[in-house]
Amino acid sequence: MKVRASVRRICEKCRVIRRRGRVMVICTNPKHKQRQG
């Protein structure tokens, strides 16, 4: 899980979602997991 000020999609499979008011990126590749913070 990467914590970044700005999250963006890295590949085609990445999905930007909102969970509990936080913007997150979920993907089939675990390296692409990000959270805004």
From Swiss-Prot:
Residues in coiled coil: none
Signal peptide positions (record): none
UniProt entry keywords in alphabetical sequence: Ribonucleoprotein, Ribosomal protein
One Pfam family in the UniProt entry: Ribosomal_L36
Annotated InterPro entries: Ribosomal_bL36, Ribosomal_bL36_sp
Keyword presence, Ribosomal protein: yes
Record-linked PROSITE patterns: RIBOSOMAL_L36 (PS00828)
Domain of life (superkingdom): Bacteria
GO BP term (any one): translation
GO MF terms, alphabetically ordered: structural constituent of ribosome
Cellular component, GO, one term: ribonucleoprotein complex
Family statement drawn from the similarity comment of this UniProt entry: Belongs to the bacterial ribosomal protein bL36 family.
Listed HAMAP family: Ribosomal_bL36
Protein name per UniProt: Large ribosomal subunit protein bL36
Organism whose genome encodes this protein: Thermosynechococcus vestitus (strain NIES-2133 / IAM M-273 / BP-1)
High-level lineage: Bacteria, Bacillati, Cyanobacteriota, Cyanophyceae, Acaryochloridales
